[in-house]
Amino acid sequence: GDRIGVIGINGMGKSTLLKLIAGIEETDSGNIIKAKNIVVSYLPQTPVFDREYTLYEYVVSENVKRRCPADDFEAKAIEAELEGEAKKILNKLGFNDITAEISNFSGGQKKKAALAACLLNGSDILLLDEPTNHLDNAMTEWLQTFLEEYRGALVMVTHDRYFLDLVCNRIAEVDKGNLYTYDTNYEGFLQKKAERLDMALSTQDKHANILRKEIEWMRR
């Protein structure tokens, strides 16, 4: 699927864009249209937990409830399947004790726990807000490989330009209320943006020349 990196200076609405896609916030105008039965996983920049969980409960048990809220037999089968995969992901993110209480975690550990839950969710679309925050180099390299092999669509906000360049195949730039899209990685985006700005300057120069001629005509 597409792996889209969302970039722009702070305050331009990158995180808000992810929240709108996730359905956490509503648009002031217009509509966001999603296909039916699409599963979306959202990693906020600062995760908030609605109650006390152990790491296992949040990453595995809550995941099972989302997938099959009513069927106990199916839930047990899915839980058995997810447990092994969850342990692999958690281990890669630096966790060894799946019974640990999340309320005792640091902010960085909470972010990694929320990331693990997103990656395990089997979603069609991953929305990740600064996923490499609090990750060391080994964890970042592992996440890069995971996302490259991920079959769904990815929309990601990150200030890690190197990670962005390696993972994403499309760039969406939020700039002064506009969204510019580029079918390329970050390196290609820099080149295409430079071309767009050069073209804009050329157009501005042409408009300025027209205005100068108008002024000259008025002064005759």
Predicted regions and their residues:
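Short cytosolic helices in intracellular loops of multi-pass membrane proteins
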Residues: 205-220
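ABC ATP-binding cassette signature C-motif
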Residues: 1-205
